[in-house]
Amino acid sequence: MITGKELRIISLLTLDTVFFLLEITIGYMSHSLALIADSFHMLNDIISLLVALWAVDVAKNRGPDAKYTYGWKRAEILGALINAVFLIALCFSIMIEALQRLIEPQEIQNPRLVLYVGVAGLISNVVGLFLFHDHGSDSLHSHSHGSVESGNNDLDIESNATHSHSHASLPNDNLAIDEDAISSPGPSGQIGEVLPQSVVNRLSNESQPLLNHDDHDHSHESKKPGHRSLNMHGVFLHVLGDALGNIGVIAAALFIWKTEYSWRYYSDPIVSLIITIIIFSSALPLSRRASRILLQATPSTISADQIQREILAVPGVIAVHDFHVWNLTESIYIASIHVQIDCAPDKFMSSAKLIRKIFHQHGIHSATVQPEFVSGDVNEDIRRRFSIIAGGSPSSSQEAFDSHGNTEHGRKKRSPTAYGATTASSNCIVDDAVNCNTSNCL
């Protein structure tokens, strides 16, 4: 069944195809570079709409499998990056042609026809703006952490895919801990009974509470694109750029048609350069945002340092390492972290609950926490290896380095960090007991 998003894309695709053929034909007939530039922008819109249609289709119809364990949730992100790259390439080609026209201006034949086509193109783009206007503005995300406020998510599968589950796994075991079992007293909360269970808590409704933590109540105002599609936002930028380009075409055609200045033909390449700037100013931020997601950068709305400090303040946690936070899509955040614990395994349950609570408070509802239990006699050694502790002050580990960053043996050594492997050889971090020395084993 065709969704509302697909119907809008198909409608705009049909309209753009008609006007692309019209603009490129009239543009070459009248030698109007502005109209030709706008027609190629329209062609890129057609390509981007095809990519958007494909992205929506695969995101809706292709679920996770053995080959793609996350499914095709990033299909629209990839489509947005392709759109942006095409636009940036188009900018350079138009700019070169416009500079040539500034050196050797060409006479624009039949500017009145160019004007009519520009007006018709503007009307078509106004229709496109009405189709996609919901995707053009950043939404403010404000909520109390007892619940998540429902937003208007245009893609049905995205609201279904927004879920909450955290895994706390013991070394040698890929087993999830049931949060309810952790919080419940008595025998059901014992580690031997909850480790065999693998429970994923999914949100059936976005307005349901994520986790009961009444002691933490504050609001966020951030430009979090959680309720809109990055690729659909890219389509909106295409349409907006086209509309502004049509206004430039109309202005240049009127100026050439109604004036007799000898330099009036310079208005055509000048308008073309303005169109190029408009396209580039929308394409570059889009490419950066899509690239950050595909490169698994830390989301701009999340402070990894703050999360780390809060986790280090949890009782029993002495150090953290291999901490990663990234976007799966614009609205789904994922995190993984290794936590070194100085308590017994059966006491880890309360710490795991607090750690998951911290992730929930920061909007991360899919997290993997791997505990590493250490005995008391090596706690002090571990503390010396980490320079970041709760509160953000440097630990005693810095005493092992001189002012030049050398160790007591005179060798250069990188200060430990929570965001990478704790050993210089980057050994396997799945399980220290197996003594894996493969450098790329993560």
Curated annotation (Swiss-Prot):
Q: Name one GO biological process term.
A: response to cadmium ion
Q: Name one GO molecular function term.
A: zinc ion transmembrane transporter activity
Cross-link Glycyl lysine isopeptide (Lys-Gly) (interchain with G-Cter in ubiquitin) position reads: K357
Q: Which residues lie on this side of the membrane: Cytoplasmic?
A: 1-8, 54-75, 134-235, 287-442
Which residue positions does Phosphoserine occur at? S387, S393, S397
Q: Which GO terms describe its cellular component?
A: fungal-type vacuole; fungal-type vacuole membrane; membrane raft
Q: What induces it?
A: Expression is induced in zinc-limited conditions by the zinc-responsive transcription factor ZAP1.
Q: Where do the record's region annotations for Disordered lie?
A: 141-170, 208-227, 391-419
* Catalytic activity entry: Zn(2+)(in) = Zn(2+)(out)
Sorted alphabetically, which Pfam families does this protein's record hold? Answer: Cation_efflux
What is the deletion mutant like? Answer: Reduces zinc transport into the vacuole and hence limits the over-accumulation of zinc caused by the deletion of ZRT3.
At which positions is motif Histidine repeat 1?
141-145
Impact noted for substituting N44I: Changed the substrate specificity of the transporter from zinc to iron
Q: Show the ranges annotated as biased composition (Basic and acidic residues).
A: 212-224
Does Transport appear among the keywords?
Answer: yes
Q: Which UniProt keywords apply?
A: Cadmium, Cadmium resistance, Ion transport, Isopeptide bond, Membrane, Phosphoprotein, Repeat, Transmembrane, Transmembrane helix, Transport, Ubl conjugation, Vacuole, Zinc, Zinc transport
Family recorded in the similarity comment: Belongs to the cation diffusion facilitator (CDF) transporter (TC 2.A.4) family. SLC30A subfamily.
* Function as written in the Swiss-Prot or TrEMBL entry: Vacuolar transporter that regulates zinc homeostasis by mediating zinc transport and storage into the vacuole. ZRC1 senses zinc availability in the cytosol, which might be performed through the histidine repeat motifs, and transports zinc from the cytosol to the vacuole if zinc in cytosol is abundant, conferring resistance to zinc toxicity. Plays a role in resistance to zinc shock resulting from sudden influx of zinc into cytoplasm when ZRT1 and ZRT2 are induced in response to zinc depletion.
Domain commentary: Contains 3 histidine repeat motifs between the 4th and 5th transmembrane, exposed to the cytoplasm, that may be involved in the binding site of zinc.
- Name-wise, this protein is Vacuolar zinc transporter ZRC1
Q: What is the lineage of its organism?
A: Eukaryota, Fungi, Dikarya, Ascomycota, Saccharomycotina
